[in-house]
Structure formats: C-alpha cells, structure tokens
C-alpha cells in the first residue's frame, strides 16, 4: 500500500487502487535503482515473511505522509532502507496533529510484527480514548 494508491471520491469515500508498474515502469528496472515503493515496505517484506500486518505498516506510513505532507523517512531510497531494516522510526511531534493520531500511527509502525497492531485492533478506535 502506498499513498499514491489511495483514491478519495468527491463524496469522501476512500478506495484502494493498484496501478502497479503502469506509469513509471522505468523506476523499477535494475538499471535505474530508484525504488519508490520501498519507503512504505514493512521490515519483514525484505525477508519474505509478510502478511496482513505488513499492510498495517504500509497504512501507517501513508498516514504519516498525509500528516507531514512529505515521505515518512526521506526522499532517498537508501535512507528508506536504513530506517525500515536497521533503525527505529524517528517519531517527532507533528505540528497541528493530535497526539492521539501520532499514537495511532505508532501502533502501525512497530518493527516487531508480533507487537504491531492488527487491522481489527486499529479499527477499534475507541481504544485510543479509553482511560
């Protein structure tokens, strides 16, 4: 899932589309290593052990980009790989964004797939407001 694949209708309905390699196939060639999609890949994708919680990571990356209006760990693919595979995600306060929203995104971007929230947990938004 990438931000580029989220489609919002005039009536506010959000849909997920997949354009694959249709518009920028050259970006994915071996000769031109500018893998744009890497920035939203979950760490486990690189080891081949991925599932629904990998999409949760990608969803969190999309939410972060929407809030920051910039890629969630830089423009450079090398930086993207380092953050996803090696380092921890550097969470910082986002001006104008509620702490509840930031906590929600943090639940998506947990490196350990076993600790990362599931889709069901994320859909139960009331858990963020419970005392």
Can you say where each PLM-predicted feature lies in the sequence?
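Terminal C-lobe "cap" of eukaryotic-type protein kinase domains
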Residues: 110-131
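Conserved C-terminal C-lobe helix
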Residues: 96-109
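Conserved catalytic-loop aspartate of Hanks-type protein kinases
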Residues: 55
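Conserved activation segment of eukaryotic-like protein kinases, specifically the C-terminal portion
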Residues: 31-44
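Structural helix C-cap motif within protein kinase domains
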Residues: 68-72
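Activation segment
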Residues: 47-52
């Amino acid at each position: 899932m990438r931000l580029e694949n989220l489609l919002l209708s005039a009536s506010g309905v959000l849909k997920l589309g997949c354009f694959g390699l249709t518009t920028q196939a050259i970006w994915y060639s071996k000769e031109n290593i500018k893998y744009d999609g890497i920035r939203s890949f979950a760490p486990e994708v690189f080891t081949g052990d991925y599932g629904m919680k990998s999409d949760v990571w990608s969803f969190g990356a999309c939410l972060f980009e929407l809030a920051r209006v910039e890629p969630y760990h830089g423009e450079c693919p090398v930086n993207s790989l380092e953050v996803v595979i090696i380092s921890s995600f550097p969470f910082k306060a986002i001006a104008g964004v509620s702490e509840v929203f930031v906590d929600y995104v943090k639940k998506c971007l947990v490196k350990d797939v076993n600790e990362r929230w599931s889709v069901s947990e994320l859909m139960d938004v009331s858990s963020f407001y419970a005392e």
